[in-house]
Amino acid sequence: MAKLGKRTRAAREAFAGKEELSVEQAVALIKSAASAKFDETVEIAMNLGVDPRHADQMVRGVVGLPNGTGKTVRVAVFARGPKAEEAQAAGADIVGAEDLMETIQSGKIEFDRCIATPDMMPVVGRLGKILGPRNLMPNPKVGTVTMDVAQAVQNAKGGEVQFKVEKAGVIHAGVGKVSFDEAKLVENVRAFVDAVAKAKPAGAKGTYLKKIALSSTMGPGVSVDVASASGN
């Protein structure tokens, strides 16, 4: 524990007094301060000027990060017949129908993304209370209810990230690993911020992108200049 304490103190000292950094500065600081014995995820938190309790202020979407996430994504697909075969051929980890529904109902959720063909939604719909809170419910708006299951599986495994605003108006996501080159992390951050910016809902009033912070899994966060985080 003493070593962990020293590393934590050192990281906090490195971050002390540093606010509103450029994306490049923030990424460099996070990479230099990362000290865990595993490849930490670089995480982004965005405070948005929305109240997601109102339907016209909900923010959700999907973005393909140019350099991937560095994470192995486990994909489940609800499909039958030829579409099930397509999903398996594309690399889906779990493929099923009612049998997969029963597995999930039993509490066994061993996947990070869930995809379904439209005809399977009556089955998937019974899992709303389980999949919904985990942001795993297939949704046509983010391309996870589709007949092109092969492409959806490839997208999920190729660095596509879904995002959805939480009750407090915050969006969290992983945008890479600390082992990534700085330039690749910067590209990923800007791609993610731009996707959220483009998903601005009609009901949003005032400042939309309010605050942005970056951190590593085990490290403290640092605030990032909003203008710097935009690729535009």
Curated annotation (Swiss-Prot):
UniProt keyword annotations, A-Z: Repressor, Ribonucleoprotein, Ribosomal protein, RNA-binding, rRNA-binding, Translation regulation, tRNA-binding
Gene3D superfamilies: 3.30.190.20, 3.40.50.790
TM segment ranges: none
GO cellular component: cytosolic large ribosomal subunit
Gene Ontology molecular-function annotations: rRNA binding; structural constituent of ribosome; tRNA binding
Keyword Protein biosynthesis belongs to the record: no
Pfam family membership, one: Ribosomal_L1
Family (UniProt): Belongs to the universal ribosomal protein uL1 family.
Subunit: Part of the 50S ribosomal subunit.
Record's protein name: Large ribosomal subunit protein uL1
Taxonomic lineage from the root: Bacteria, Pseudomonadati, Pseudomonadota, Alphaproteobacteria, Rhodobacterales
